[in-house]
Regions:
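Glycosyltransferases and closely related glycan-assembly transferases
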Residues: 79-92, 100-115, 128-133
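Glycine-rich phosphate-binding loop signature in dinucleotide/nucleotide-binding domains
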Residues: 24, 82-90, 184-187, 266
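Acidic, amphipathic alpha-helical patches
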Residues: 39, 73, 80, 126-127, ...
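Donor-nucleotide binding loops and adjacent catalytic segments primarily
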Residues: 42, 46, 173-174, 180-270
Length: 286
């Protein structure tokens, strides 16, 4: 499995691995990610071995960092090839993020079956780059095929988005019995979840922190959690303190919500970005 950089790339890979393990208990699964991405926490927490390939995205502005990114784009497939030769997989599956490029490119060059999953309606850069190299392109939206079909019509399969099993609790009552979701509210009458993805979203953080300051701090019966994201974490903490919110036990600022299925099943309101995986998770819950 390969996919990294954000939760939107890592979590579907974990969901696929989870399903493979369920159907083929004796299967061996390893992940390849970057040294810096959230996969280093999520993959290891899920109990899988994680290899590293250093690869970085190009910045749109002129930057010396682009020189290193270009160098890594050229050298990373060789590193990925060594990992693949060592692990000897029967198939390599990617779920996006820059790290999928060298790993799937290396797999294709070695003649190992490969596929990439695209969760968005418009395919990302990595999917477009790999489309002619991989054996199969898995799609969440039928419309995505319009952007790839002229060149790769026989490769595409409409499958939807892979979700971790915890998201298929159809109601709070059902989820409470199966996964202890009732504890997620910690005794509060209502719960609000707010998040802008694993990296964070500045405007969502600012709006939600203002909401905490002006509304939820006056409602101690409401548990309000904001996951600020890794990039926005420092700024969100400064604003949290500036608004004097640190002393309210019902107001929580965290970097990432690691028990999202449990929390989401118990939530009365979710405020979030409309990322493809996030929308799929909410749809599965409701």
């Amino acid at each position: 499995m390969t996919g990294g950089g954000t939760g939107g790339h890592v979590n579907p890979a974990i969901a696929i691995a989870e399903t493979i393990k369920l159907n083929i208990p004796g299967s061996e699964i390893a992940f390849v990610g970057t040294p810096r991405g959230i996969e280093n926490k999520l993959v290891r927490a899920a109990g899988y071995e994680l290899y590293h390939v250093d690869v970085r995205g190009l910045r749109r502005s002129l930057s010396f960092a682009n020189i290193k990114a270009a160098y890594l784009a050229l050298t990373s497939p060789g590193h990925a090839k060594k990992i693949i030769k060592s692990f000897k997989p029967d198939i390599v599956i990617g779920t996006g993020g820059y790290v999928s490029w060298p790993v799937l490119r290396a797999a294709a060059s070695l003649g190992i079956p490969s596929m990439i999953h695209e969760s968005n309606a418009y395919p990302g850069v990595t999917t477009r780059m790999l489309a002619r190299h991989v054996d199969t392109i898995l799609l969440n939206f039928e419309k995505t095929a319009e952007y790839l079909k002229p060149l790769h019509p026989k490769k595409m399969v409409l499958v939807g988005n892979p979700l971790r099993s915890g998201f298929f609790a159809s109601s709070e009552k059902t989820a409470s019995a199966s996964a202890g979701v009732s504890d997620a509210k910690e005794g509060y009458q209502k719960m609000i979840l707010s998040y802008g993805g694993s990296l964070g979203a500045q405007h969502i953080n600012e709006a939600v922190l203002a909401m905490m300051r002006d509304y939820t701090k006056y409602h101690p019966e409401i548990l309000h959690i904001l996951a600020a994201g890794s990039i926005e974490w420092e700024d969100a903490n400064k604003m949290f303190d500036a608004y004097g919110l640190r002393g309210y036990p019902n107001l929580r600022l965290v970097e990432y919500i690691y028990d999202m299925p449990r929390r989401m099943a118990a939530a009365d309101l979710v405020i979030c970005r409309a990322g493809a995986m996030t929308v799929s998770e909410i749809a599965a819950m409701r």
